[in-house]
Swiss-Prot record:
Region feature (Disordered): 44-74
PROSITE patterns, alphabetized: PB1
Domain topic, free-text comment: The N-terminal half of the protein contains two conserved domains I and II. Domain I includes a slightly degenerated ERF-associated amphiphilic repression (EAR) motif which seems to be involved in the activity of transcriptional repression. Domain II is required for the correct degradation of the protein through the SCF-mediated ubiquitin-proteasome pathway. Interactions between Aux/IAA proteins and auxin response factors (ARFs) occur through their C-terminal dimerization domains III and IV.
InterPro entries documented for this protein: AUX/IAA_dom (IPR033389), AUX_IAA (IPR003311), PB1-like (IPR053793)
Gene assigned in the entry: AUX22B
Subunit structure: Homodimers and heterodimers.
Annotated protein name in UniProt: Auxin-induced protein 22B
UniProt domain PB1: residue ranges: 99-186
Cellular localization per UniProt: Nucleus
Assigned GO CC terms: nucleus
Main location: nucleus
Protein source organism: Vigna radiata var. radiata
Cross-referenced Gene3D superfamilies: Phosphatidylinositol 3-kinase Catalytic Subunit, Chain A, domain 1 (3.10.20.90)
């Protein structure tokens, strides 16, 4: 039995003890300091013995005389976290000043384009831009005849998912309801609006 006591004293358990604290510092068991820390952090403490309850009541009485400690200030946001790519950061900062971009596809063309509807003031400007973009002639729109004299007819998909001819509704309504544009062959666009 004595050899066991000697063995425990040789191990230097204090040096190899795992605890929550900085290395090289001594932690003193002081009930008053512990209760002050608990009161300052607004956390409850588990009562272990009746002596602890007496010291806690003394500490709370002492706390009334000490100036009240305010809650710590909120943590500052870390700059650069979460990581955002620069193009997304710029687009978030610009906000609603951005344009209304819609995809434009053309039957027979192997590529898509995007156009900003806010750039154009009306249908004639948009149609002129589409003609130069896809190198085709769309022609003039009339409510009776649609796009007469053209092999293609510009159509758009509205919010409801319906395909309509470009020019059927007023420009402002078109800008707010257009989801995407498609330049169809005239034969496919016959049932959408007027006879082409």
């Amino acid at each position: 039995m004595e050899s066991r006591v000697v063995f425990e004293s040789d191990l230097n358990l204090k040096a190899t003890e795992l605890r929550l604290g900085l290395p090289g510092t001594e932690e003193k068991e002081d009930n008053n300091l512990r209760t002050h820390a608990v009161l300052r952090n607004n956390k409850r403490q588990v009562r272990e013995t009746s002596q602890d309850s007496v010291s806690i009541s003394k500490a709370s009485h002492h706390q009334q005389h000490v100036e009240t400690v305010s809650a710590p200030p909120p943590k500052a946001k870390i700059v650069g976290w979460p990581p955002i790519r620069s193009y997304r950061k710029n687009s978030v900062q610009e906000g609603e000043g951005d344009g209304i971009f819609v995809k434009v596809s053309m039957d027979g063309a192997p590529y898509l384009r995007k156009v900003d509807l806010k750039v154009y003031g009306g249908y004639p400007e948009l149609l002129k831009a589409l003609e130069t973009m896809f190198k085709l002639a769309i022609g003039e729109y009339s409510e009776r005849e649609g796009y007469k004299g053209s092999e293609y007819a510009p159509t758009y998909e509205d919010k409801d998912g319906d395909w309509m001819l470009v020019g059927d509704v007023p420009w402002d309504m078109f800008v707010t309801s257009c989801k995407r544009l498609r330049i169809m062959k005239g034969s496919e666009a016959r049932g959408l609006g007027c006879v082409v």
